[in-house]
Regions:
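Acidic/histidine metal-binding catalytic segments
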Residues: 131, 190-193
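Short, intrinsically disordered, charge-balanced linker/junction segments flanking boundaries
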Residues: 194-200
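Extracytoplasmic, non-cytosolic globular domains
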Residues: 118-122
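A short, structural motif
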Residues: 1-94, 103-112, 124-132, 143-152, ...
Length: 200
């Protein structure tokens, strides 16, 4: 294994892999390889980030598609790409994705889609916990009352529902774009019932 980490650190990573449920030599090896690369390439993610990335790859089904190593590296590459192309911080992107994992996977969003939202929100100076909660509530409300929410922002109901059912991300973007066209006062009137306890 080509790595810059000392053997003791590799052993610790192997133990981490075991705690995450990797119980074969191959899966532990792949976790150690990916984690060692991520820890060097994305050092500013901080402690525990590789475990979070591994959990995300499992929750979103990437591990089943690409294997332990490649799924983790794909997520790490997404984080690196976004942070290099805007002012978003890597820890914000990963924490946001972690907070969005439950509803994001249920709504069939991809990790790159969620991380793109994270990068945009962080670049605009939003706090991670508040941002994730706001997006979660928006998504839940759109699925709970799609016709009502479409009408509030002037969207054609059937078109919006069809778009939302096809792609959560496309539906959310359609809603947000329509919201932006309303102007600040009307947009706040639409969103305030969802976010009043968040101080937004």
């Amino acid at each position: 294994m080509d790595t810059r980490l000392a053997r003791e650190q590799l052993n610790l990573l192997a133990q981490e892999g075991g705690r995450l449920g990797y119980n074969t030599v191959q899966s532990v090896r792949e976790y150690v390889e990916a984690a060692s690369i991520i820890n060097v390439a994305l050092v500013d993610l901080g402690e525990g980030a590789t475990q979070t990335i591994a959990k995300l790859s499992n929750i979103f089904g990437m591990e089943q598609m690409y294997g332990v190593r490649d799924s983790m590296l794909k997520i790490g590459s997404t984080v690196n790409h976004l942070s290099q192309n805007c002012t978003a911080a890597k820890p914000f992107i990963v924490e946001f994705a972690q907070r969005m994992a439950g509803i994001g996977s249920t709504a069939k969003m991809t990790i790159p889609e969620i991380m793109a939202f994270a990068a945009t929100l962080d670049a605009h100076g939003q706090k991670v916990e508040m941002s994730a909660t706001a997006l979660q509530r928006t998504i839940m409300e759109l699925f709970k009352k799609p016709a009502e929410m479409a009408q509030k922002v002037g969207l054609e109901t059937n078109t919006f529902i069809e778009t939302l059912n096809k792609s959560t991300t496309q539906g959310v973007m359609m809603f947000l774009e329509a919201l932006g066209r309303l102007g600040e006062d009307k947009a706040l009137a639409v969103l305030s019932p969802l976010f009043q306890d968040l101080g937004l």
